A protein has these predicted regions:
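C-terminal cap of metal-dependent C-N hydrolases
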Residues: 1-6, 11-12, 76-122
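His/Asp/Glu-enriched, well-ordered alpha-helical/loop segment
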Residues: 1-80
Length: 125
């Protein structure tokens, strides 16, 4: 199913008080690590499209899911050889490995596994 051409990849999971589902911290690293690198079920470009551009287009969010002039500059810089999910049912907030930087709205929000700006971005409804 993950390789279906019409499919998109998203998650609505959250972590609250250290409790939740491991997909809250691991959905996208799992796609890149397991389904792209390990199993080859998706190319890296197709996985990126399914995780970013396709959902943004479906939700009619023209400034999301792409890199370009006027876009929101939400970026995740990761090492494709190392990215992997680590969250489990007993430790759902464990951060993934292989993510170097996260930029939200052009602001550096995460370096390695350390949040450096927890106020980057805006709430979307």
């Amino acid at each position: 199913a993950v390789a279906d051409s019409y499919g998109m990849i998203a998650s609505d999971a959250i972590i609250a008080n250290g409790k939740g589902h491991p997909r809250a911290a691991g959905t996208f690293p799992r796609i890149m690590g397991k389904y792209v690198r390990e199993e080859g079920a998706l190319s890296l470009l197709e996985a990126l499209r399914k995780c970013s551009h396709a959902p943004a287009e479906r939700l009619q969010l023209p400034d999301k899911g792409r890199i370009g002039i006027g876009a929101d500059a939400d970026l995740v810089i990761f090492d494709a050889e190392k990215i992997a999910d680590k969250a489990t049912y007993t430790e759902p907030a464990l951060p993934p490995v292989g993510i170097e930087f996260v930029f939200v709205g052009g602001r550096k929000a995460l370096v390695g596994q350390r949040i450096v700006d927890g106020t980057a971005g805006v709430l979307m409804r």
